[in-house]
């Protein structure tokens, strides 16, 4: 289920993906020229020995590469396998520990926020659901995000209190073997190569769908990075978060301010007269940059796109920061984000995630 920083990153990635998808219509990359059988053979070889149904995993990964015109290089194959191993251990619809407790907590939290008494919640959950069981019985038996997503969909669609609590918003926002964001998948389904019998949400919880959209989120955009670890960090924190965290660091060095290097250079929804931390610090450089507040805002609005790396603002800020530091500062940094989710039972960060995936990636390249 989605966390606040992660949800912002999903929205950022979905928006960026839509922009890139439109831009790529006229300039789609050529289809991979490698024979599909060769690609599948390499995928099988590079998987850990313990993985079951290796041929099926390989087929779905190869299909996703071909449909999205992503070159199936060893590096790209291992990037996908590393994320999949980290996120699910090669389980299409992985179980989540303590999910019934987590789900009931979410329902109770929403009820409390709306001042709905507990007895009304209990009465709503006692209603018989479309599969014949009560919602309370189903809630006690959920084991996977797909189970919970289907329960929420039925609860919202069939029980008045469900619609009141969730307002047509299903709290399950990630799923599948690569734990990809469902909003991202829904925004990027135009080239999905399989028939959709239910919804894109349903497809995310399958092996083929989870891999297709996970691969799109991981590899479906160009980056300025020279190391895969920054792409892995972006997978967790949002497209271009590593590039933007480095930009925040440059702003901090150039101004002498302490900034959170979280990759969010614009506070979501902030009006022009109430800028976020990074934008506020950047305004101190406005006279040196020859840019007023409105111009800075417009420039920062490109930070979810590749071309921000080549923008005048990016170049000028790094020129000032490099001069002050007396050396060239990094152009990519893993964002400093603490992962926050009911599914997480210990303190983890984006850096931890990216480095864990990078370790699996390097092991894969050696197989």
Predicted regions and their residues:
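Bacterial N-terminal signal peptides
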Residues: 13-23
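Cell-wall glycan-active module
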Residues: 2-3, 8-9, 23-367
């Amino acid at each position: 289920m989605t966390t606040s920083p992660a949800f912002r990153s999903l929205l950022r990635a979905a928006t960026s993906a839509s922009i890139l998808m439109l831009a790529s219509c006229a300039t789609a990359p050529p289809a991979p020229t490698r024979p599909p059988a060769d690609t599948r053979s390499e995928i099988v070889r590079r998987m850990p020995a313990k993985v079951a149904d290796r041929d099926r995993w390989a087929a779905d990964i190869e299909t996703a590469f071909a449909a999205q015109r992503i070159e199936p290089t060893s590096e790209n194959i291992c990037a996908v396998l590393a994320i999949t191993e980290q996120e699910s251990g090669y389980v299409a619809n992985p179980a989540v520990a303590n999910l019934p407790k987590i789900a009931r907590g979410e329902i109770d939290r929403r009820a409390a926020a709306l001042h709905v008494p507990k007895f009304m919640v209990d009465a709503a959950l006692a209603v018989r659901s479309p599969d014949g069981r009560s919602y309370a019985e189903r809630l006690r038996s959920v084991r996977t995000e797909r189970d919970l997503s289907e329960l929420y969909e039925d609860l919202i669609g069939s029980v008045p209190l469900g619609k009141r609590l969730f307002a047509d918003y299903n709290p399950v926002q990630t799923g599948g073997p690569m734990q990809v964001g469902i909003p991202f998948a829904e925004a990027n389904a135009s080239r999905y190569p399989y028939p959709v019998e239910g919804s894109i949400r349903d497809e995310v919880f399958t092996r083929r769908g989870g891999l297709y959209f996970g691969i799109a989120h991981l590899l479906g955009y160009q980056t300025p990075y020279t190391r895969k670890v920054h792409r892995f960090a972006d997978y967790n924190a949002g497209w271009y978060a590593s590039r933007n965290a480095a930009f925040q660091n440059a702003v901090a060095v150039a101004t002498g301010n302490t900034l959170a290097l979280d990759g969010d250079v614009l506070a979501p929804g902030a009006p022009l007269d109430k800028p976020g931390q990074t934008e506020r610090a950047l305004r101190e450089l406005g006279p040196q940059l020859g840019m007023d507040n409105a111009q800075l805002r417009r420039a920062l609005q490109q930070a979810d796109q590749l071309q921000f790396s080549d923008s005048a603002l990016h170049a000028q800020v790094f020129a000032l920061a490099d001069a002050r530091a007396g050396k060239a500062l990094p152009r990519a940094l893993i964002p400093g984000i603490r992962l926050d989710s009911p599914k997480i039972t210990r303190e983890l960060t984006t850096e931890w995630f990216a480095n864990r995936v990078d370790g699996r990636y390097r092991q894969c390249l050696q197989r």
